[in-house]
From Swiss-Prot:
Chain's gene name: UHRF1
Short name of one Pfam family: SAD_SRA
A GO cellular-component term linked to this record: nucleoplasm
Lineage: Eukaryota, Metazoa, Chordata, Craniata, Vertebrata
Post-translational modification: Phosphorylation at Ser-298 of the linker region decreases the binding to H3K9me3. Phosphorylation at Ser-639 by CDK1 during M phase impairs interaction with USP7, preventing deubiquitination and leading to degradation by the proteasome.
Organism annotation: Homo sapiens (Human)
Phenotypic consequence of residue 448 to D: Decreased affinity for DNA
Region described as Linker: 296-301
Record's protein name: E3 ubiquitin-protein ligase UHRF1
Site residues, Histone H3R2me0 binding: 327, 330
Length: 793
C-alpha cells in the first residue's frame, strides 16, 4: 500500500510506499522524516480534517490507497539571547508605528462605550420635549420597518429630539426643532415583544384610516395596500405602491401596482385584495387618532396555526408541548429558532441560563463526540465488532490489496446490472481485484460470486480456488462457494463440510433457464435464454487452465448457466457444480480474432494510480542498498561468500526481476488509433446543436495517450463532456436546451415540478411552457458507445 504526502503549501509531494492498513502513525512519521528531512516532533499530519495522533493506525483514520496526507511543519521557537536582540524584534504595534490598534488596545474601550451607555439616559432626559414633532404621545401611527419596507400599526410612547453633534455650537439648542431632528419612540401593536423602538420622522406617519373605493382608484396614484412578496396569492403585510394598471371584467377586477420594498421595488404585481386599498394620510391633513382605531388585517406570523391563540402550535409556541403560556420561561434555540419551556426540557431547567447562546437538544453538538486537535480518536462501535479487533493473531492483514478499499465506484449502471458494463470491452485487464471492483465488472473484493439469492448472479471470478474447476475456454465447469471454515479473518481454507444451494450458490442457479431445484439441480433446455453472467479470469487459475491471463485479471465476456448439479468433489464433500457456456458477440481474448481486437483497441494492463511510481521507487531503493553493500564489501576486502557457504550470484540482467512487473517488457506494442463507424460519424454530424462539444471530443482521437487505450480515453472524454449537471451521470434521454446545455429529461422534469423553469447549468429562463424534445441523434450515439447504460434509470 502507498499514499501521497504533501506539504501544506503544495510545493513538495512524495510517495510513501511499503505501508499497511495497520501501520502506526509514529512509523509513518519516521518514513516521512526520510523523505522530507523533518523531525517527527515537528510534524503535524492532517487527513480529512483530522490531525493524526500517535498510537493510532492508518486503518483507524480510514486512509485508503493513494490518498493524500497533508504535512504541516512546526516552527521551532528560537528565543533572543540578549536584551538588544529582543528589542530589535519588537513589532510595529509594540513600537507605536502601527496604524491599527494593538491587542491590548482592542480589548480596552478607553471608556468610550461605557460613557455612551451611561450618558444615553441623561441625554434623552435632557432633550425630551412634549411639544416636538407632528405626532404626540399616545397617538396611533404607522411605522415602517426599514429592513423590509412594510408599514405596521404602532403607538407613540415618547418624542425626543436628536442631541446636537459635536460640530454644532451649544446655542443651537435654542433654535426651533425641525421634523428631521425628531425621534419617535413607538411600540408596535402586533409585536409587543419588540418593546419600544426608536424611529426617524421619515419612517412614521399618521395611521391610515380611509379605504379608497374601486371606482376612485386611478393609474399613477400612490396608495397603501396588502401584498405578500413570497406568496403573492396569500395575505401579507402593508406596503406603499403606485398603481400601474386597472382592469375590470364582468366577473373579476384586476389591479396591478409597483410595490415599494424599502430601496427596491417589485413592478407590475397583481393585487389580490382590491377592496382593502388605503389612502396615505399626509402630515397635518387629518385629526390625530388617540382613540382605539380600526385594525387592519395582516398575514399571520405563523402559517401553521394562523395565529390562533386557542390552538396548540409547536412552531410558534413551545416546540415540545405547543403551549403559549409562560413566555418569560421560554428559551429560543440559536440554531433552529424554536421556543422551549425550561420545564419541558429533559432534564428540566430551574431557571433561564445566563449564557448568550443556547441550543436545543436536537441542535447542540455533544462535546464528548468532538475530537479536538491533539486528542485521540473515539472508539468505533463498528470496528470493535470486527474479527480483526477480537483476534489474538499478530499477523499483519493490512498489506493486501484487497484491504485498501475502493478509491472510486462504478455508477454508470446499478450494482444489480446484468450483462456487459458500458465502456468495458472484452479483453480489458486489471492488475488487482480491487480495480475490477472499481470498474463494476465484479464488485466484491474477495468473493468469487456476486449475486443475490432472490435475484440471480451478476458476475463471477474464475481463479482456480477449487480443485474441481475445469476450464475449456468457451465453456467451463465452476464450483460453488461454501463448505470451508473461514472464521476469524481467513481468506481461504480446505473443504471441511458439504456445500448448500443457498446464498450466492442459489443466486448462480437462478441464472439457469430452468425451475430451481435445490436437491438434484436442473438443466436448461434453452440455455441462451438464461440470465447473463460476466466472467473474469484471474492469473491464479493458470495452474489448471491455459486460458488464464499471464498477469492480473481479465474480463472474458458473457457466459450463461447451462446446468447445475450436486456431486461429491475431490475433497470427499458434496459440492455444487455449474456448467457455463460463452454467449458473447465479441471474440474471446485467447483467440486470434480476440487478440487482434485487443491490439486494435489498444487494451493494456491497467495499474492503480501511483502503482508504477511506487514500484519504481521500491526497485530504486533495492538497487541503492545493493550498491552500498557491494561498496562496503569491496572497501573492506570482504569475501564474496554471503552466509553459510553460499556464494553470491549476480543475475544476468543486472538485477532481480520481479514476476509480473510492468517493466519486464521493453518492446512497446504499436497501438492503432480508434476510429468511429460510418453511422456514428453521421449521427454526430446530425447533432448540430452540440457541434462545438463534438469537435472537442473528436480532437481527443488525434491525441496519443501516454497510458491506456485510445478507445477508453475517447469514452472517458465523451462521458465527461456529456455529463448531466443535475445527476452527475452520463445524460440519458438528453434535452439540449436553447442555451446549448444537455440535461436528462427526468432531471429537467423534476426541476419543472419544483417550479424551477430555468436551465440547471446557466439559469437561462426556459419558460413554463418549454417543450422538451429528446435529442435522438445524441441518444443513439451514446447507446452505441455505452450499450445498456440506461438500465435502472
Amino acid at each position: 500500500m502507498w499514499i501521497q504526502v504533501r506539504t501544506m503549501d503544495g510545493r513538495q509531494t512524495h510517495t510513501v510506499d511499503s505501508l499497511s492498513r495497520l501501520t502506526k502513525v509514529e512509523e509513518l512519521r519516521r518514513k516521512i522524516q526520510e523523505l522530507f528531512h523533518v523531525e517527527p516532533g515537528l510534524q503535524r499530519l492532517f487527513y480529512r480534517g483530522k490531525q493524526m495522533e500517535d498510537g493510532h493506525t492508518l486503518f483507524d483514520y480510514e486512509v485508503r490507497l493513494n490518498d493524500t496526507i497533508q504535512l504541516l511543519v512546526r516552527q521551532s521557537l528560537v528565543l533572543p539571547h540578549s536584551t538588544k536582540e529582543r528589542d530589535s524584534e519588537l513589532s510595529d504595534t509594540d513600537s507605536g508605528c502601527c496604524l491599527g490598534q494593538s491587542e491590548s488596545d482592542k480589548s480596552s474601550t478607553h471608556g468610550e462605550a461605557a460613557a455612551e451607555t451611561d450618558s444615553r439616559p441623561a441625554d434623552e432626559d435632557m432633550w425630551d420635549e412634549t411639544e416636538l414633532g407632528l405626532y404626540k404621545v399616545n397617538e396611533y401611527v404607522d411605522a415602517r420597518d426599514t429592513n423590509m419596507g412594510a408599514w405596521f400599526e404602532a403607538q407613540v410612547v415618547r418624542v425626543t429630539r436628536k442631541a446636537p453633534s459635536r460640530d454644532e455650537p451649544c446655542s443651537s439648542t435654542s433654535r426651533p426643532a425641525l421634523e428631521e431632528d425628531v425621534i419617535y419612540h413607538v411600540k408596535y401593536d402586533d409585536y409587543p415583544e419588540n418593546g419600544v423602538v426608536q424611529m426617524n420622522s421619515r419612517d412614521v406617519r399618521a395611521r391610515a384610516r380611509t379605504i379608497i373605493k374601486w371606482q376612485d382608484l386611478e393609474v399613477g396614484q400612490v396608495v397603501m395596500l396588502n401584498y405578500n412578496p413570497d406568496n403573492p396569492k396569500e395575505r401579507g403585510f402593508w406596503y406603499d405602491a403606485e398603481i400601474s394598471r386597472k382592469r375590470e371584467t364582468r366577473t373579476a377586477r384586476e389591479l396591478y401596482a409597483n410595490v415599494v420594498l424599502g430601496d427596491d421595488s417589485l413592478n407590475d404585481c397583481r393585487i389580490i385584495f382590491v377592496d382593502e386599498v388605503f389612502k396615505i394620510e399626509r402630515p397635518g391633513e387629518g385629526s390625530p387618532m388617540v382613540d382605539n382605531p380600526m385594525r387592519r388585517k395582516s398575514g399571520p406570523s405563523c402559517k401553521h396555526c394562523k395565529d390562533d391563540v386557542n390552538r396548540l402550535c409547536r412552531v410558534c409556541a413551545c416546540h415540545l408541548c405547543g403551549g403559549r403560556q409562560d413566555p418569560d420561561k421560554q428559551l429560543m434555540c440559536d440554531e433552529c429558532d424554536m421556543a422551549f419551556h425550561i420545564y419541558c426540557l429533559d432534564p428540566p431547567l430551574s431557571s433561564v441560563p445566563s449564557e448568550d447562546e443556547w441550543y436545543c437538544p436536537e441542535c447542540r453538538n455533544d462535546a464528548s463526540e468532538v475530537v479536538l486537535a491533539g486528542e485521540r480518536l473515539r472508539e468505533s462501535k463498528k470496528k470493535a465488532k470486527m474479527a480483526s479487533a477480537t483476534s489474538s493473531s499478530q499477523r499483519d492483514w493490512g498489506k493486501g490489496m484487497a484491504c485498501v478499499g475502493r478509491t472510486k465506484e462504478c455508477t454508470i449502471v446499478p450494482s444489480n446490472h446484468y450483462g456487459p458494463i458500458p465502456g468495458i470491452p472484452v479483453g480489458t485487464m486489471w492488475r488487482f481485484r480491487v480495480q475490477v471492483s472499481e470498474s463494476g465488472v465484479h464488485r466484491p473484493h474477495v468473493a468469487g460470486i456476486h449475486g443475490r439469492s432472490n435475484d440471480g448472479a451478476y458476475s463471477l471470478v474464475l481463479a482456480g480456488g477449487y480443485e474441481d474447476d475445469v476450464d475449456h475456454g468457451n465453456f467451463f465447469t465452476y464450483t460453488g462457494s461454501g463448505g470451508r471454515d473461514l472464521s476469524g479473518n481467513k481468506r481461504t481454507a480446505e473443504q471441511s463440510c458439504d456445500q448448500k444451494l443457498t446464498n450466492t450458490n442459489r443466486a448462480l442457479a437462478l441464472n439457469c433457464f430452468a425451475p430451481i431445484n435445490d436437491q438434484e439441480g436442473a438443466e436448461a433446455k434453452d440455455w441462451r435464454s438464461g440470465k447473463p453472467v460476466r466472467v473474469v479470469r484471474n492469473v491464479k487459475g493458470g495452474k489448471n487452465s491455459k486460458y488464464a491471463p499471464a498477469e492480473g485479471n481479465r474480463y472474458d465476456g458473457i457466459y450463461k448457466v447451462v446446468k447445475y448439479w450436486p456431486e461429491k468433489g475431490k475433497s470427499g464433500f458434496l459440492v455444487w457444480r455449474y456448467l457455463l457456456r460463452r454467449d458473447d458477440d465479441e471474440p474471446g481474448p485467447w483467440t486470434k480474432e480476440g487478440k487482434d481486437r485487443i491490439k486494435k483497441l489498444g487494451l493494456t494492463m491497467q495499474y492503480p494510480e501511483g502503482y508504477l511510481e511506487a514500484l519504481a521507487n521500491r526497485e530504486r531503493e533495492k538497487e541503492n542498498s545493493k550498491r552500498e553493500e557491494e561498496e562496503q564489501q569491496e572497501g573492506g576486502f570482504a569475501s564474496p561468500r554471503t552466509g553459510k557457504g553460499k556464494w553470491k550470484r549476480k543475475s544476468a540482467g543486472g538485477g532481480p526481476s520481479r514476476a509480473g512487473s510492468p517493466r519486464r517488457t521493453s518492446k512497446k506494442t504499436k497501438v492503432e488509433p480508434y476510429s468511429l463507424t460510418a453511422q456514428q460519424s453521421s449521427l454526430i454530424r446530425e447533432d448540430k446543436s452540440n457541434a462545438k462539444l463534438w469537435n472537442e471530443v473528436l480532437a481527443s482521437l488525434k491525441d496519443r495517450p501516454a497510458s491506456g487505450s485510445p478507445f477508453q480515453l475517447f469514452l472517458s472524454k465523451v462521458e465527461e463532456t456529456f455529463q448531466c449537471i443535475c445527476c452527475q451521470e452520463l445524460v440519458f434521454r438528453p434535452i439540449t436546451t436553447v442555451c446549448q446545455h444537455n440535461v436528462c429529461k427526468d432531471c429537467l422534469d423534476r426541476s419543472f415540478r419544483a417550479q424551477v423553469f430555468s436551465c440547471p447549468a446557466c439559469r437561462y429562463d426556459l419558460g413554463r411552457s418549454y417543450a422538451m424534445q429528446v435529442n435522438q441523434p445524441l441518444q443513439t450515439v451514446l447507446n452505441q458507445l455505452f450499450p445498456g447504460y440506461g438500465n435502472g434509470r
